[in-house]
């Protein structure tokens, strides 16, 4: 938990646009790593980190932007759950890769 608090403190030092850039970079990582069957743990970790980023930063945006971030957070949680049962399906991973770029 201490490490998570350090990460949160460090993350919140960045400006909101920089934080959104970090989130966008994570979505790109999800897209890239999802193409490979042996990267489940990496993708899961990046999804979890992205959900935390949203949790920590959504309140710094107006209500409509925050709602979009929360919508993305829910999508990330859904992908995480689905990945546990469908990761071995290449077609699902490729769909995840495509969807995470949008």
Q: Model segments located where?
A:
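Surface-exposed peri-terminal alpha-helical interaction modules
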Residues: 1-102
């Amino acid at each position: 938990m201490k490490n998570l608090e350090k990460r949160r403190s460090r993350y919140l030092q960045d400006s909101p646009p920089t934080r959104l850039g970090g989130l966008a970079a994570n979505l790109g990582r999800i897209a890239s790593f999802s193409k490979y069957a042996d990267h489940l743990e990496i993708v899961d970790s990046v999804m979890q980190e992205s959900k935390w980023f949203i949790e920590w930063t959504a309140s710094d945006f107006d209500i409509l932007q925050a709602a979009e971030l929360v919508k993305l957070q829910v999508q990330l949680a859904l992908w995480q759950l689905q990945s546990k049962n469908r990761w071995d399906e290449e077609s699902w991973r490729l769909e995840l890769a495509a969807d995470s770029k949008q």
